[in-house]
Amino acid sequence: MTYDNLLNRFLTYTRVNTRSDESSETTPTTQSQVDFALTILKPEMKSIGLQNVHYLENGYLVGTLPANGNFPYKIGFIAHMDTADFNAEGVNPQIIDNYNGEIIQLGQTDFVLDPKEFPNLNNYLGQTLITTDGTTLLGSDDKSGIAEIMTAIDYLVKHPEIEHGEIRVGFGPDEEIGRGADQFDVEDFDVDFAYTVDGGPLGELQYETFSAAAAEIDFMGRNVHPGTAKNQMVNALQLAMDFHGQLPQEDRPEKTEGYQGFYHLLSLEGTVDAAHASYIIRDFDDEAFVSRKDFMQKIADKMNAHLGAERVQLQIYDQYYNMRKIIKKDMTCVKLAKKVMENLAIEPIIEPIRGGTDGSKISFMGLPTPNLFAGGENMHGRFEFVSLETMQRAVDVIIGIVCFKQ
């Protein structure tokens, strides 16, 4: 279905810089997210008919659309307000009508969207694409989701003849840095199950995520003059290289897919005297996840034993877990979304998320929360784009879910 206000709503959201900040200790991590919630989203939520709209200390903006029919479930929809760690100031979207399959120039920059480099463009011939101007990201992750949820609510309020169950809407902060759901209030949200609207292409329906951990490693060296260094110098950077060299070369993001896990070196910095490395660890299987963490610890222990001192100091922190374990207990939310997509002639793409969503943590709080497509492609950078037609289909799915009767 065509929704007249969807595009303008989305464009309005994208132009607000809501980039999160991992170095910040506040919640939300940036004031711009608070401003976006309170000055743009909250008034709009009230104006389209949501009730009990309130902003919580955890950074979530929540509202309710009461049921106007007899339905068995209260259902929530969640999207995040922040955008990824890429320039988000001065977002100036381009609209490409009736995409013809050719190269898309991104504003006045030298950057282009070339189907040879991005073959996913070929899935959108004849559609309306929204791209960046090459200087920023677009913010489709996850302002597409916000716009789709708001548009669905707006449509239902304007069409009271369409019966639906009780709907709760939640827009939260800091998903991109993994903190958004840490303080999510399940009791306040008060639904039977929920969906994050934070996926990619048409049809994505996901209830499996990585289990995730972060590893921080300090390497303690000993710096002496290189001319007299024999049997005295301990080069911290070399220790870091030695550590990394003992990890399986095939277990890296660029060499894995599907259900394969990995170790990912995010950063390495230092001097001869001291170095620091940051890793993330990812796997879908619980035992493999534990084994990966244990393997890193064994490398550190072996190196320290060889060095005769605690020169490799490893700390590992769990970040989130595969929500499959929770959702598998009751697949109602997945089966419902799958059925609705099929009724809409959308082929469900049920694959694991090689990442995480707020739904990962929220599911482990007792609220099953799988992920629905929102439409974004090439997310987190200047090559990001989204199809308006896919966004419209996402609105169709949201409406279909809350109106579905067995």
Curated annotation (Swiss-Prot):
GO biological process: one example: peptide catabolic process
EC number: 3.4.11.4
CC per GO annotation: cytosol
CDD domains in alphabetical order: M20_peptT
Cofactor section: Zn(2+)
Enzyme active site: D82, E175 (proton acceptor)
Binding site for Zn(2+) 2: D141, E176, H380
Residues holding Zn(2+) 1: H80, D141, D198
Chief place where the protein resides: cytoplasm
Coiled coil, from the record: none
Keyword presence, Zinc: yes
InterPro entries associated with the record: ArgE/DapE_CS, Bact_exopeptidase_dim_dom, Peptidase_M20, Peptidase_M20_dimer, Peptidase_M20B
MF (Gene Ontology): metallopeptidase activity; tripeptide aminopeptidase activity; zinc ion binding
UniProt family annotation: Belongs to the peptidase M20B family.
Name of the protein: Peptidase T
Species per Swiss-Prot/TrEMBL record: Streptococcus mutans serotype c (strain ATCC 700610 / UA159)
Gene it is expressed from: pepT
